[in-house]
Structure formats: structure tokens, C-alpha cells
């Protein structure tokens, strides 16, 4: 029987491989309690039985758990820095075929933005971006490549006009030439192996939800995944302290 939040964390780890101990407890517990109430369950035990036996409800749980906030060209000033300083420097040091990893890529907005920015500097055939997330639903959406107009609100027109096809009044579909630049795969930052010899790792606005110990462990693994002289690109509110 799942009696309390401690039992619930153990149950979720066994069922999904997601370790809730790595997330800030007050924040995560509040989100989970809200989800349980929304699904009209009386407590942890009832909800655990439901997600164990209902694949759709389990998918909803994982999707809700892995906080997905993403849009194209989010925080334009940072993208400008990437475009004008970081990428040219990496290309100068390592050549045009950079190994890039978009970690916790959500619905694909970030790796596709990377591909479009990089396409101004190197041939499309030389662009290969490895993109991972723990959530199957967002990965499927990323592979589909269809986005709302709101997701593209910060994207410069030069990219929108060149790489998107409008679908009705509200949606846009990304071009196949950009889709081919990105390889999506399911991966858990807390337990799965990391790609090695990366020139650039992008992981933005994700680790703010993790405990300090979990963040430290992930940053160490990121460091081990980078080549000497490589770059870790994080969100504008995130700090890495040695």
C-alpha cells in the first residue's frame, strides 16, 4: 500500500525510473497533489493503482511531471550570443561538423532553433543535433514538427519564412530539411548514459527544478561529456558554481 509521499516516490521510481528525490520536494509534491485531486483520486494509493493499470494515465503523469515549457528562440539575447560568438568560436576550433546535444529538449523547439541558426554558418548536411527528453509525448510532438503560432512568436522572420509552412491560421510545420538535422531519443538525465565528445551541450531552464545535489551530479556528467574547449549553454537565470 502506498501510504505517503515517501512510498509514492519509491513506487514512481520502480514504475518509471524517475527519481523524485532529485526534484525540489515542496514544488513537486504540490504538483502531484494537484494532479491526484484533478483526477478525483482520494490519495496516493488509489492514484498509483490507476497509473499502474492505465497506460494513458501513466503518460499523462509523466508528461505533467516533466515540466515542459518551450518555444522557438526563447530569450533572444542568448540566441544572439550563441549565433554571433559561441558557434563561430566552436566552428573555428573544431570545424563545421559539431557534435551538439540538446538535453531535455521538450517539444523540439530548441534543437530545431539550433539547426536553423547553425544553417547560416555550415551546410545542412554537416548539421547533426542529438536531442533527448524523458517524455515520450513531447518527443512524438517534436518528431511531427507542427507548432502553434504562439510557439514561434520570438522566432525571427528570416527563419520562419524560410523553414516553416503555414497550416491554416494557427499552426506551422517545420521543413523536412531542418527535421533531418535532429535525431530525437528518449533519455533520463538522472540515470541514463550521456553522449560523449560533445562540442556543445544545450540544457536550459530544466535543472532549476532539481535539488542542488542532483544539479551538481548532472553538471559533472555534462562536463565529462564535453571535449576540452567545448561549451555548456544554460538558461539566463541559471548559475553554475564550481
Roles of regions detected by a PLM:
Residues 2-101, 219, 235:
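Conserved AdoMet
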Residues 82, 201, 226:
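Residue-level signal for inorganic ion chemistry
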Residues 95-110, 127-130:
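Conserved class I S-adenosyl-L-methionine
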Residues 107-124:
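Conserved SAM-binding loop of SAM-dependent methyltransferases across substrates and taxa
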Residues 126-202, 206-214, 240:
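Extended basic-aromatic, gly/pro-enriched interface segments that bind polyanionic ligands
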Residues 216-228:
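A short glycine-rich, Lys/Arg-flanked "PGG" loop and its adjoining helix->strand segment in the class I
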Residues 228-236:
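Conserved beta-strand signature within the Rossmann-like core of class I S-adenosyl-L-methionine
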Amino acid at each position: 500500500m502506498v501510504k505517503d509521499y515517501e512510498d509514492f516516490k519509491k513506487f514512481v521510481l520502480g514504475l518509471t525510473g524517475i527519481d523524485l528525490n532529485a526534484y525540489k520536494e515542496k514544488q513537486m509534491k504540490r504538483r502531484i497533489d494537484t494532479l491526484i485531486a484533478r483526477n478525483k483520486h482520494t490519495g496516493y494509493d488509489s492514484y498509483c493503482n490507476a497509473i499502474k493499470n492505465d497506460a494513458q494515465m501513466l503518460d499523462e503523469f509523466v508528461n505533467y511531471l516533466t515540466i515542459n515549457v518551450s518555444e522557438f528562440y526563447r530569450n533572444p539575447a542568448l540566441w544572439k550570443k550563441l549565433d554571433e560568438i559561441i558557434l563561430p568560436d566552436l566552428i573555428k576550433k573544431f570545424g563545421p561538423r559539431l557534435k551538439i546535444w540538446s538535453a531535455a529538449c521538450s517539444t523540439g523547439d530548441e534543437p530545431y532553433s539550433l539547426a536553423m541558426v547553425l544553417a547560416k554558418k555550415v551546410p545542412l548536411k554537416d548539421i547533426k543535433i542529438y536531442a533527448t527528453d524523458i517524455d515520450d509525448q513531447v518527443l512524438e510532438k517534436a518528431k511531427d514538427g507542427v507548432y502553434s503560432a504562439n510557439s514561434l512568436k520570438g522566432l525571427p522572420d528570416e527563419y520562419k519564412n524560410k523553414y516553416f509552412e503555414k497550416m491554416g491560421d494557427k499552426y506551422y510545420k517545420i521543413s523536412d530539411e531542418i527535421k533531418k538535422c535532429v535525431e530525437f531519443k528518449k533519455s533520463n538525465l538522472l540515470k541514463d548514459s550521456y553522449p560523449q565528445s560533445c562540442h556543445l551541450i544545450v540544457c536550459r531552464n530544466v535543472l532549476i527544478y532539481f535539488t542542488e545535489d542532483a544539479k551538481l551530479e548532472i553538471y559533472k556528467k555534462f562536463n565529462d561529456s564535453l571535449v576540452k574547449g567545448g561549451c555548456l549553454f544554460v538558461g539566463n537565470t541559471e548559475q553554475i558554481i564550481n
